[in-house]
Amino acid sequence: TNGGPWFPAYEKCDYHEIWTACGERLKESKIKTVGICYTKNSIHSKLSYENFVKGVLAVGDRIVKIHNIEEMKLLDQCHAMFQVSEANMSSPDNEFRQKLKLYADEKKKPRLVIDTGFVKNKRFNHEDLDRYMALGDGGIKRKARYFNEHSPSDRWKKLKFEMKPWRTTGKHILVIGQNEVGISSQHINVLDWWSKIIQEINELTNRPVLFRKHPSQRRLPIYGIYKPSPFNNKDIIQDLQNDIWCVVARTTNGAVDAILNGIPVITPDDWSMAYDVAGHDIKQINNPPTPDRTQWAYDLAYCQWAFPEYASGEAWLHYRNHLWPPEN
């Protein structure tokens, strides 16, 4: 203003520059910085990092690369963290992953963990990269936050996956194993549990028991009457098509495959992504629950993303908008 009778002391100034500067500071304050923590070095991990970084940058946020424990001090400038896989005893990066979890818990910072997806995850074909990878805050499987409660049907429809009706017949009980040193096996002696649960199944039903071994698992149940699955180390769909009455499992994603293919599941483990549509007591083996799976499937589709969705920023925005709502 040039001043005047009401504001004679005011000098002329450029409000455009002032408001532009204020706008830039406001924009700067809303930019989020994500610590990209390099915890795994497989081909799928490299693609996960590459595409997630593209997505963060695509929406105008920043990244800081963190390759080891010594560089973790850089996390102090970050609003959130991203890593591939959770800590487990068999990983050479186990200590790094454990320290990342401790840091996130102490600082109360979001820690996004990418892991194997649940539908169309292609985990039995490592060369096929057209796959879905799960993304959760604070962990993996059902111990992570996905901000997916009461999700709409859009992502499930996008998968174009036909969920099979519940099966009402079947000859075999399939017990699905997993890697005893994996992170989702650390809260239980899974080897002892397999023996115990197979013995209980033997007492409750005359149906023969098949045991599906994890490809990386060497030790097998030593008690109970069972036969090895004829499809060990092959796509689990072949097992599920082998006249299966019910699947019994802990936290393996094979339980999700069973549910999607219409085979009832019994799991006592709330780590399992199948838990909400499964039975939890082995005494249900002769009459396993077959609940409505519709909303469960919709919610499941919001737990996982394809590589192009990571690269576009769609996956990152889903979490960003829940962690820091736009109105804030």
Predicted regions and their residues:
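N-terminal pre-catalytic "stem/leader" segment of glycosyltransferase-like enzymes
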Residues: 1-86, 181-182, 323-328
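Short loop/turn segments at strand-loop or loop-helix junctions that form parts
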Residues: 2-4, 35-40, 82-86, 114-118, ...
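Catalytic phosphate/metal-binding cores of nucleic-acid and nucleotide-processing enzymes, i.e., regions
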Residues: 4, 26, 160-172, 209, ...
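Well-ordered, non-membrane alpha-helical segments in soluble/globular domains
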Residues: 12-19, 45-54, 92-99, 189-200
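Leloir-type glycosyltransferase catalytic cores
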Residues: 34, 123-170, 276-328
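Donor nucleotide-activated moiety binding/catalytic core segment of transferases
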Residues: 66-72, 210, 214-263
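Short, well-ordered secondary-structure micro-motifs within conserved domains or adaptor modules
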Residues: 68-102, 246-250
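Conserved catalytic-core segment of nucleotide-activated headgroup transferases in glycan assembly
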Residues: 168-220
